[in-house]
């Protein structure tokens, strides 16, 4: 089941850097942890936007936005609902950030999904169907009332900043969960042609030993 109909990955730069478009990233220093999803998929972004000669600077996640603010790097990759709020916490106004979401720049990858083991699918598909039905019901309630959903999180983790996390959740809902594509395909479902293109691009970006077969990784018989 697809949860994030679009990848939350994005490139972010400060307007004062002079970077305005994806083409401006050529020859620049970019920063992200080595395992960052946006960094891993950047070859696809670069190909779609004719970006070349990027130098990568690696850092631990807590330093990513700090290094951008300090000018140690020209741009960063990260999830929108993480890095945008982290930049704000470091004194950067939203209007001073150049945001290039992968989904808006030729990289229509799916994001987080629910994965089931093939053995479980074969032996107990009904249990998966019931779980997905419960998840879908809960997701609908969260989308309808994000603030109330965060209160449930707060009840289990008292140090949660409800204002900040409500904004983060709403940003995630608006950009990757309750998107136009999700409305078109249906919550939890996907477009086979789009998945096939993504599989090919991911195979190229990650240098997989074998090509990814979309028919092997997607099973909608239990949705």
Walk through the language-model features, giving the residues of each.
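Short, glycine-/small- and polar/acidic-enriched structural segments
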Residues: 1-60, 65-70, 74-81, 100-102
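Class I S-adenosyl-L-methionine
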Residues: 43-47, 88, 154, 203
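Secondary-structure end/capping motifs
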Residues: 123-205
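Predominant activation on well-ordered alpha-helical scaffold segments within soluble catalytic domains
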Residues: 43, 85, 196-199
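Short, surface-exposed acidic
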Residues: 53-56, 94-97, 159-173, 208-216
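Pocket-lining segment of extracytoplasmic ligand-binding domains
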Residues: 63-66, 70-161
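Structural motif detector for alpha-helix initiation sites
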Residues: 21-22, 192, 214
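Conserved C-terminal helix/tail region of periplasmic/extracytoplasmic solute-binding proteins
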Residues: 195-223
């Amino acid at each position: 089941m697809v949860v994030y109909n679009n990848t939350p990955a994005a490139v972010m730069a400060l307007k004062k850097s002079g970077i305005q478009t994806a083409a401006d990233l050529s020859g620049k220093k970019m920063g992200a942890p080595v395992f960052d999803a946006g960094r891993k998929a950047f070859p696809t972004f670069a190909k779609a936007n004719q970006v070349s000669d990027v130098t990568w600077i690696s850092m631990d996640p807590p330093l990513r936005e700090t290094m951008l603010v300090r000018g140690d790097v020209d741009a960063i990759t990260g999830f929108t609902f993480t890095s945008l709020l982290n930049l704000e916490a470091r004194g950067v106004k939203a209007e001073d950030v150049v945001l290039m979401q992968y989904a808006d720049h030729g990289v229509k990858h799916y994001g987080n999904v629910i994965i089931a083991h093939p053995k479980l699918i074969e032996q107990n598909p009904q249990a998966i169907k019931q779980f997905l039905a419960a998840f879908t019901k809960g997701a609908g309630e969260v989308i309808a009332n994000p603030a109330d959903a965060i209160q449930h999180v707060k009840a289990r983790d008292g140090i949660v900043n409800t204002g900040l996390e409500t904004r983060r959740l709403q940003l995630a809902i608006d950009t990757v969960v309750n998107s136009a594509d999700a409305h078109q395909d249906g919550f939890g479902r996907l477009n086979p042609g789009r998945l096939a293109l993504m599989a090919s691009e991911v195979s190229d970006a990650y240098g997989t030993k074998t090509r990814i077969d979309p028919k092997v990784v997607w099973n909608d018989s239990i949705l």
